């Protein structure tokens, strides 16, 4: 695929390409394949989720593990992934001032345990994620700045009252993380972590979870959309590490690789030589490669030391060596994904820490370190053992050594790493990709930069960042909103002392088995993975 394509254009081109492969079998002119029921789709998770609470967790593996189990009020259309359509809500209206949204719910929907669904479940779910004392790093982080209250008007009607008219509200409600859980299940279990608590209204029922091995769904025969799903089930193998994942793909153990971590070019080429029954494609995945510094303890409670790391990190080298060139270095927003809300890349390339050659920035970084630590210093550099994080971490350690910061690697199992990072138990996280919840410019700031961000692991707070983010969120005029986001990006790039350092927007290679039909990639790595309309051809 052409690297310059926007996400939407890329989706359209990919959909056309996949449609062409569907049409490839010998069919009469004008004939269409009839969806076939049955079969198991095989897929993979990059790690063991451990915990399964979609409201309280942020790892992709949690969302993937539960994607087909729960429904939302809204969803992104499986047939047209840029379009928001109803899910549990059959229709909705907005007030003239854009501050009140009323959702009219489907009638007759049942939970997987046979209990009836109602507006009480919607209110319980969103009251939970909006509770100031409840940490909801995805759905809650998106909605808390916008939503004032949620009311159940009657058993089939829910009303959301906003603090202000907000363009990202509907995309956030349609997010794959803003799923509706059963009030009676929350009351019984207290959270959604147990396999027994995975009781949804989605196209599939939770069947099995073997830690470190496999997650399985089975068809929900009482799904509220007649005739769906087509599949009998979905099997997700837990495959840790690129070599293991690639070996499974080459051996035809999995039919789809559509999520993080993407294949690198060399892996995609190797797969292409091993299998001719797959469609391989390149795409951005709405994901940022971050380095995090712990701003709550030495040495990175010192803004000079945070600036030193920001100056020293060679983003271009990290993209070239760890992503094989498939990424957009330095950008806080990627123009391929959010258009002109992103600061022009030629301006970004001149920012401290991004400009090439690196000599002047490295010299200044070294001066700042020597000012506070004349003999240099030793630090622990943490990564989770997923993707190619360890390799990235070694590159980061080598770059920091040039300015007198001597790093020692500490690796974590995936779930244990998330737990440690969430508690602030680290000094540097050398590599942590964060995927956007919605294809919307506000997403990255609510994920990693504001004081209340769900993935602001460094716990750094800058009132100016919070103020600019809120101003951009409230603005409804496109040009004024663009200027607000430009000001915010310039501020972060110029000040250079934030504890969340954006290395690059990640791109990569993916594949689908040619037998899969009705599959289209979503706007984010979290979307369109319920597989409600996917079927397997013979």
Residue ranges and their predicted role:
Residues 33, 104, 139-186, 208:
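Surface-exposed binding/hinge segments that line
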Residues 43, 211, 241, 258, ...:
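Ligand/substrate-recognition segments at binding pockets and active sites
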Residues 60, 64, 210-214, 219, ...:
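Detector for C-terminal structural segments
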Residues 78-79, 174-229, 233, 363, ...:
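Gly/Pro-rich hinge or "lid" segments in bacterial periplasmic/extracellular proteins
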Residues 149-152, 207-218, 235-297, 320, ...:
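Extracellular/periplasmic solute-recognition and catalytic clefts
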């Amino acid at each position: 695929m052409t690297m310059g394509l926007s996400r939407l254009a890329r989706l359209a081109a990919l959909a056309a390409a996949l449609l062409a492969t569907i049409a490839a079998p010998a069919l009469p002119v004008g004939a269409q394949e009839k969806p076939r029921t049955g079969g198991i789709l095989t897929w993979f998770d990059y790690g063991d989720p451990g915990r399964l609470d979609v409201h309280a967790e942020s790892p992709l593996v949690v969302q993937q593990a539960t994607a087909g189990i729960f429904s939302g009020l809204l969803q992104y259309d499986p047939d047209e992934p840029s379009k928001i359509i109803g899910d549990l809500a059959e229709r909705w209206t907005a007030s003239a001032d854009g501050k009140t949204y009323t959702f009219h719910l489907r009638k007759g929907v049942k939970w997987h345990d046979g209990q009836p669904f109602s507006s009480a479940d919607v209110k319980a779910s969103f009251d939970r994620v909006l509770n100031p004392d409840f940490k909801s790093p995805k759905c809650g982080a998106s909605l808390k700045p916008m939503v004032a209250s949620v009311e159940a008007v009657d058993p089939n009607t829910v009303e959301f009252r906003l603090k202000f008219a907000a363009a990202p509200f509907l995309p956030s409600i349609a997010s794959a993380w803003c799923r509706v859980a059963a009030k009676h299940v929350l009351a019984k279990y207290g959270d959604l972590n147990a396999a027994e608590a995975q009781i949804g209204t989605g196209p599939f029922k939770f069947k099995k979870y073997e830690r470190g091995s496999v997650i399985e769904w089975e068809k929900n025969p009482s799904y509220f959309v007649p005739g769906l799903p087509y599949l009998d089930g979905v099997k997700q193998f837990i495959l840790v590490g690129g070599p293991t994942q690639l070996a499974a793909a080459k051996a035809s153990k999995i039919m789809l690789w559509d999520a993080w971590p993407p294949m690198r070019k060399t892996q995609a080429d190797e797969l292409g030589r091993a299998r001719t029954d797959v469609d391989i494609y390149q795409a951005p995945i709405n994901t940022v490669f971050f380095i995090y510094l712990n701003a709550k303890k030495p040495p990175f409670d010192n803004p000079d030391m945070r600036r030193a790391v920001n100056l020293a990190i060679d983003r271009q080298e990290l993209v070239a060596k760890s992503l094989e060139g498939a990424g957009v270095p330095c950008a806080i927003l990627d123009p391929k994904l959010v258009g002109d809300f992103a600061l022009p890349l030629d301006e970004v390339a001149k920012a401290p820490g991004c400009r090439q050659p690196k000599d002047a920035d490295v010299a200044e970084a070294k001066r700042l370190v020597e000012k506070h630590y004349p003999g240099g210093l030793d630090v622990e550099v943490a990564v989770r053992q997923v993707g190619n994080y360890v390799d990235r971490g070694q590159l980061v350690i080598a770059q920091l050594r040039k300015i007198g910061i001597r790093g020692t690697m500490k690796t974590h199992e995936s779930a244990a790493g998330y737990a440690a990072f969430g508690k602030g138990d680290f000094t540097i996280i050398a590599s942590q990709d964060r995927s956007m919840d919605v294809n919307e410019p506000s997403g990255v700031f609510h994920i990693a930069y504001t004081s209340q961000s769900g993935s602001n692991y460094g716990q750094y707070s800058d009132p100016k960042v919070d103020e600019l983010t809120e101003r951009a969120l409230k603005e409804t005029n496109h040009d004024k909103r663009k200027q607000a986001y430009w000001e915010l990006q310039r501020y972060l790039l110029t000040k250079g002392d934030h504890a969340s350092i954006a290395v690059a927007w990640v791109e990569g290679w993916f594949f689908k088995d040619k037998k899969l039909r009705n599959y289209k990639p979503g706007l984010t790595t979290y979307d369109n993975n319920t597989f409600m309309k996917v079927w397997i051809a013979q």
